[in-house]
Swiss-Prot record:
Protein name: Small ribosomal subunit protein uS4c
CDD domains: S4
Domain S4 RNA-binding: start-end pairs: 92-153
Keywords of the record: Chloroplast, Plastid, Ribonucleoprotein, Ribosomal protein, RNA-binding, rRNA-binding
GO biological process: ribosomal small subunit biogenesis; translation
Organism of this sequence: Ostreococcus tauri
Role: One of the primary rRNA binding proteins, it binds directly to 16S rRNA where it nucleates assembly of the body of the 30S subunit.
Similarity comment: family membership: Belongs to the universal ribosomal protein uS4 family.
Locations listed in the record: Plastid, Chloroplast
Length: 197
């Protein structure tokens, strides 16, 4: 499946707040469409609940269905809670780290910065948004828009990262924990969704 390029606020109205997808806040808190306001009346099936949790993760981090399934399979092979390992792998992607450092307004914008070669990791230009950042790696950019956004960023940088806003330089201090992930999602439902695949 290709990258999603459609209306983003429509997705936020259906799934809830997705900070990595868009910074816009919808005016209406019900799904778009003719039956949007009354859609909250119907009982959601267990499948739909799990599907919506999975879609939240997909749209927030901008990964395809195939990529997400690959992350789930990799998390299953690792030791530890599968759901937390899945979130940790997604959060340690280079585009997600660039976004969380405050260098970009969304993960989508961070992905574009990375793929255009505007971000370096330990002094080397990395153009792969899915690159897994490790502890101790230094992420830096000299691009004017990134430096400007880093200086004016008013959000909170998670404690597993450290940032120098004036130089647009950040460092991965330690692995991310579940409490530091800025997305409200039930990872156990996502693992259950993929349990048959």
């Amino acid at each position: 499946m290709a990258r999603y390029r459609g209306p983003r606020v429509k997705i936020v109205r259906r799934l809830g707040e997705l900070p990595g997808l868009t910074t816009k806040i919808p005016n209406r808190n019900y799904p778009a469409g003719q039956h949007g306001p009354s859609s909250g009346m119907t009982k959601m099936s267990q499948y739909r609940v799990r599907l919506q949790e999975k879609q939240k993760l997909r749209y927030n981090y901008g990964v395809s269905e195939k990529q997400l399934l690959s992350y789930v399979r990799r998390a299953r092979r690792m030791k530890g809670p599968t759901g937390e390992l899945l979130l940790q792998m997604l959060e340690m992607r280079l585009d997600a780290v660039v976004y969380r450092l405050g260098f970009a307004p969304t993960i989508r914008a961070a992905r574009q910065y990375v793929s255009h070669g505007l971000v370096t990791v330990n002094g080397q230009a990395v153009t792969i948004p899915s690159y897994q950042c490790s502890v101790g790696e230094v992420i830096k950019s000299n691009s004017a828009p990134i430096v400007e956004h880093a200086k004016t960023f008013g959000g909170v940088v998670p404690s597993h990262l450290s940032v120098d806003k004036n130089n647009a330089t950040g460092k991965v201090e330690r692995n991310v924990t579940r409490s530091q992930i800025g997305l409200t999602v039930n990872e156990l439902l996502i693992i259950e969704f993929y349990s048959r695949k």
